[in-house]
């Protein structure tokens, strides 16, 4: 809507105005911005500048208890001094025990620490389960498998805090969904993937004309379904590298035919984490980055161009069955399995992480219980006295 362009700096994705941005809201009287807690300072400033000349009303809708934009301590939308504010009190996404848990985590009524193992907390509107780790994993596998069989991936997801935990859980989730085939192929037809970064034109086998933007074929955080997979040997010399830059490997990866709604793309994928091909690719990227830095601002420009072309030549997609809490914000799922690293996050964002993770669930929340102090256990039993006693 704002006619922005994507600028990629290191591993960050930034929005910048274009020549069309200033007039983007010219004919609009009202613009509604949902999930406003994720609007960063730069995007907020651009939106306000665009709206001012045309007196366009901007209505921001969001929850200040959710996570702020990456790299910011708080959501700038809620710090605006001249805004007219209103609070909505009725929760409609979830009810019952899920709502109770989300509310207690949000207002501090329950500590954001690993819960105790408890009997099922449930009523006719939903449930919360606190189980030993093995039982949690078994139920997660069953739920993911059932969601796949029903062709409803939003029926169950695993949420975690760190990418390290995500990479550890992804193989477990893929085996649950795809069985033995998961260990034979890094990507399978029918698999639901999510873009972990914007996919740029060099990664598209169809060229940039099929994408969502001139240089970007698929935005970040977009889910796609894999239709077909083809092995591909990618010679990095095709991207301007030469033996003068060091060893130039051939990267064994795959091209995936994917669809997202009416959009169909053929993308060259990054090799999976931990594979020989991924280590070789990462090694070349690290070497180019260091060479560019050593060459200085003027002499390093050509090296940086090769670096960015190579980086953009591989799409960063991963299985959508396991998501980080940050990536899940704005979505909702039936059953949510919360990994324990969410409760071990830095204290400054732990409450927001726990609240966002739990509030993604429409029906059920599954937590790993155990090791809680008597004080923590009493807090949980008191908070859910009615639904525990009805179990």
Map each language-model feature to its residues.
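Short loop/turn elements that form and flank the Walker-type P-loop nucleotide-binding site
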Residues: 25-27, 52-55, 153, 332
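Conserved P-loop NTPase motor core of helicases/translocases
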Residues: 1-49, 111
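Hydrophobic positions in the central parallel beta-sheet of the AAA+
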Residues: 31, 59-60, 158, 338
